[in-house]
Amino acid sequence: MPRVPITKEGFERLKIELQRLQRDERPMVIRAIEEARSHGDISENAEYEAAKEKQAMIEGRIQDLCQKMGECEIVEPSDNDNGRAIFGSTVVVEDTETGEVTSYRLVGPYEADVQSGTISVVSPLGKALIGKEEGEEIRVQTPKGVRNIEVLEIRN
């Protein structure tokens, strides 16, 4: 199975979340379940049901994080400034139709978050940007439709 690229920072964020869930959230929900059980009949105990649901969500997220972390390969962004967009690069682009300028950091799929300015190298835009140089124009199909993009700046 191919490894999933991730930055060192992205892997650390996954690790911190996993530790928080295991160290803080899991024991807290176990105590809540025990407390709800102590109230007697659990068949009609809303507190018990809510705690069990929360426990299932926490355990599911822990399992998800463990799986993702096992699939990851930490990739250090290259210091090779060949002028092309690569994994870890920050790319400033302009939508040639709207004039909107946006900055994206190219990262792995497990750390991508458009709201914080990171996009996955396997997303349509991420794939289109990999290997491009400043001044190049690309046409890319996105969920919002076809966009014409000019690469303004690349920082590796």
Curated annotation (Swiss-Prot):
SUPFAM superfamilies named among the record's database cross-references: FKBP-like, GreA transcript cleavage protein, N-terminal domain
Keyword Lipoprotein attached: no
InterPro entries reported for this sequence: GreA/GreB_C_sf, TF_GreA/GreB_CS, Tscrpt_elong_fac_GreA, Tscrpt_elong_fac_GreA/B, Tscrpt_elong_fac_GreA/B_C, Tscrpt_elong_fac_GreA/B_fam, Tscrpt_elong_fac_GreA/B_N, Tscrpt_elong_fac_GreA/B_N_sf
Stretches of the chain forming a coiled coil according to its record: 44-67
PROSITE patterns: GREAB_1, GREAB_2
Stated family: Belongs to the GreA/GreB family.
Biological role: Necessary for efficient RNA polymerase transcription elongation past template-encoded arresting sites. The arresting sites in DNA have the property of trapping a certain fraction of elongating RNA polymerases that pass through, resulting in locked ternary complexes. Cleavage of the nascent transcript by cleavage factors such as GreA or GreB allows the resumption of elongation from the new 3'terminus. GreA releases sequences of 2 to 3 nucleotides.
Name this protein carries in UniProt: Transcription elongation factor GreA
Protein source organism: Syntrophobacter fumaroxidans (strain DSM 10017 / MPOB)
